[in-house]
C-alpha cells in the first residue's frame, strides 16, 4: 500500500527560476547547470530550425527536464504495480514500475526511458521516529535530449534519480516536491539537481494537452 496518494491533477508552482522556466532561454545560456566542455560545444552549436525540420521538438521534454517545465500532471494507477504520470505540456507519459520490475531484453530507448520506482523511508534523526516515506525513481534507457529548450544536452549515457515527497500547506492542500538528479558522464561535470513543486487541484479544469514546441 502506498504511504501517500499521489494520484489526481496537479499544477506546477513556478516559484523559483521563473525566467529560465517561463521564457525560452537564449542560445548559450546554461547558467546554473554544471555543463562540461563537451556539453558547451553541443549547446553552442544548437540550431532550433534544424530541430524543427527534423521533427525533434520533444528533445526538451525528456524525463530529465520534464518535471521542471510549467506543466500540469495527471497521475493515476495503471495497475497495482504501475504508476502513470501524464503531462499536458508536450503530452508526455511516464510509466513508473514497482515490484522489482526489469526492462524487457528488447527494450528501446525513449524520451521517458524505463523507470523503476519504490517507496523509501526518510528518518527524522538518529533516535527519532521515521519522518516520512517518499517515492524513489530510477530512470535509464533515455534518448539523448535537452535539459533546456536552448539545446543544453544530456546524452544516452545519462541516468536520472528522482525523489518525490508529499507536504501539506497550512490550508490543507497537498504539495508534492519532485527532485531530479541528472548524472551525465559526458555533458555534465557534476550531477545536476532540479527541484519542482506541484499543488493538487480539485478537478481537471486546468488540464489542456498541447504538443511539443520550441516556445512556451
Predicted regions and their residues:
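PEST-like low-complexity, intrinsically disordered acidic/proline/serine-rich tracts
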Residues: 1-216
Amino acid at each position: 500500500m502506498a504511504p501517500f496518494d499521489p494520484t489526481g491533477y496537479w499544477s506546477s508552482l513556478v516559484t523559483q527560476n521563473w525566467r529560465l522556466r517561463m521564457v525560452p532561454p537564449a542560445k548559450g545560456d546554461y547558467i546554473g547547470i554544471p555543463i562540461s566542455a563537451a556539453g558547451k560545444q553541443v549547446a553552442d552549436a544548437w540550431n532550433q530550425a534544424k530541430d524543427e525540420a527534423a521533427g525533434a521538438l520533444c528533445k526538451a521534454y525528456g524525463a530529465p527536464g520534464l518535471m521542471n517545465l510549467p506543466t500540469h500532471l495527471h497521475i493515476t494507477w495503471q495497475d497495482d504495480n504501475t504508476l502513470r504520470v501524464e503531462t499536458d505540456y508536450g503530452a508526455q507519459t511516464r510509466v513508473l514500475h514497482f515490484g522489482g520490475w526489469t526492462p524487457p531484453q528488447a527494450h528501446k530507448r525513449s524520451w521517458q526511458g524505463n523507470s523503476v520506482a519504490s517507496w523509501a523511508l526518510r528518518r527524522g534523526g538518529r533516535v527519532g521516529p521515521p519522518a516520512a516515506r517518499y517515492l524513489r525513481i530510477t530512470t535509464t534507457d533515455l534518448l539523448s535530449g535537452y535539459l533546456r529548450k536552448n539545446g543544453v544536452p544530456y546524452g544516452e549515457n545519462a541516468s536520472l534519480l528522482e525523489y518525490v515527497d508529499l507536504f501539506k500547506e497550512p490550508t490543507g492542500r497537498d504539495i508534492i516536491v519532485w527532485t531530479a538528479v541528472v548524472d551525465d558522464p559526458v555533458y555534465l561535470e557534476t550531477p545536476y539537481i532540479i527541484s519542482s513543486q506541484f499543488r493538487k487541484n480539485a478537478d481537471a479544469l486546468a488540464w489542456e494537452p498541447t504538443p511539443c514546441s520550441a516556445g512556451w
